[in-house]
């Protein structure tokens, strides 16, 4: 019988039951392994790998036909040379992380707008200072750079909170979700940034997105603008961002991703002014709804795979998503 290697540690009994039900329907058996490790002497047994398998372990999977990553960002898996053959299908779990990451974006955005980091210091010093100015998402001008599942989930939440205008920016100009008031392409980004109060970045790591927020584009943002990045650290000229924050040329930034990761203890990013820094945890798999969706999406595409249909979350390795 054909076999699936499920290489993850979060599977509950209910998750396993769902995976095994879908697998049985499709003529597969399932074996489970700890997240991040598929034994080399067993790897060749599997036609499908689902979960988190390090790129360097894939060569041993001589009969691999489909790798389904249990996460959204697959930049480490787009190089054809890591696979036993160039025809291996690659898919991700886009659609599982929109809720949890959009909530993170909303949280850090409100923290910055409401001056929470400064109020935290005030309270730690046992002071009763109420004079800091605060702002609101309501009535604000927001640009979402990257209008996939994550960016769009945030746009919907921002719209519900009364954002004045939400602009979506993406690689190609297609009709966007109703949450977006205006849609633009990457080539039109320069015209959008000067009108942006809150810039949210939710982009994959590709050649096209590398330093898309360049030094020149950071300078186009208003001095009272905020930047939030939950995609990949490579999308921002990090040195230029630090200079802008330290020089007071931006109101603040929240980064859940950076370069490099993990960040060395002596890196200047730690000490950058008006910066909220988190260690790439916005999409943490601890939320039950994220885990449930991840398994649900895999089972859906497993049925597509078995029926010879196109995978819904198939990744184009040439463009990176």
Each language-model region and where it sits:
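Short, polar loop motifs at secondary-structure junctions
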Residues: 35-37, 52-56, 74, 168-174
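C-terminal helix-to-coil terminal segments
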Residues: 89-104, 118, 261-321
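Phosphate/diphosphate ligand-binding glycine-rich loop within oxidoreductases
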Residues: 44-123, 131-134
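Short acidic low-complexity segments
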Residues: 33-42, 55-59, 179-195
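Glycine-rich NAD(P)-binding loop of Rossmann-like domains
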Residues: 89, 119-153, 182
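N-terminal glycine-/charge-rich "phosphate-binding" loop or analogous flexible N-terminal tail
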Residues: 1-48
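Phosphate-coordination loops involved in phosphoryl transfer and adenosine-cofactor binding
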Residues: 1, 138-141, 224
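Rossmann-like adenosine-cofactor binding region
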Residues: 172-268
